Design a protein with these regions (language model features):
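Membrane-proximal intrinsically disordered regions of secretory-pathway and membrane-system proteins
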Residues: 1-253
Length: 253
């Protein structure tokens, strides 16, 4: 070790270099994720890992950003409150029966249990979000089974995809916040809510089309059909994640 490195100034310089390196890798990773779908996955699999942060790190950073935006905007995309489960979700009838039985078992009332559930589901939504990425990987195995890609390819692809999805949701929440600031209705408008959902799914489909072409080298026509199915899979996993959070939180809170 050089004498310069043992001084305070030398230590500070090393810290600055380290953080600059992290920042540059992060920005390079984000730029590649948003503008070159699939390129990060290909680079990782080809061993080009030093210029970028690892897939799990990128996913976790996107997760932190998303839930920070969700908290700032008081939105509940994943951390669905109990009242919404009981009245506004496709499984609301089933949820009403499950919640009623749980209240009896806990010897409590809906009014007392609701804040407990809402607090717990918000925490669970943050810590378990990786389950969505893991659930998507088997869909890739089925869709591209003839490509004989290792399981790790599908896992890395899924982590990058859901990092993109979380950033997409973060951007949507930011736009909604600006809209509300200037007097717009936000998600209170059913039309805007549905339009935004369609736009997000289209963006996801475009990403999948480009990314699967880069990673799996699929022909155009077949790729379109598979992307449609995979996009439906993304939407189904989001709904499935919300329902899973209901069950996990209901029987643990």
């Amino acid at each position: 070790m050089q004498e310069r490195e043992l001084t305070i100034r030398g230590f500070v310089e090393q810290v600055v270099v380290a953080f600059t390196n992290i920042d540059s890798r992060l920005m390079r990773s984000l730029l590649s994720l948003l503008t070159r779908p699939g390129a990060l996955t290909v680079a990782y699999l080809q061993g080009q890992r030093r210029p970028y942060i690892r897939p799990l790190q990128l996913f976790l950073l996107a997760n932190v950003l998303f839930f920070a935006m969700e908290s700032l905007t008081n939105s509940t995309i994943f951390s669905t409150p109990l009242d919404s489960h009981l009245h506004n979700q496709p499984w609301d009838g089933l949820a009403q029966g499950l919640v009623a039985n749980r209240l009896v078992a806990l010897h409590t009332t809906l009014k007392l249990y609701t804040p407990v559930f809402d607090s717990a589901v918000a925490l669970n939504a943050r810590t378990l979000v990786i389950l969505m990425a893991l659930a998507f990987a088997p869909l890739l195995s089925v869709a591209f089974y003839r490509k004989h890609r290792p399981v790790v390819v599908n896992v890395v692809f899924s982590l990058h995809l859901y990092a993109f999805v979380l950033l997409l949701f973060s951007g949507a929440l930011a736009l909604l916040t600006v809209s509300v600031f200037f007097g717009g209705p936000g998600l209170a408008s059913e039309t805007l809510d549905k339009s935004l959902s369609v736009a997000l799914m289209m963006a996801c489909a475009i990403y999948l089309y480009a990314a699967t072409g880069a990673v799996y080298d699929e022909t155009r026509t077949i790729r379109i059909l598979k992307v449609v199915a995979l996009t439906v899979g993304v939407a189904a996993i989001v709904l499935g994640y919300r329902f899973a959070l209901l069950l996990i939180t209901l029987y643990s809170a």
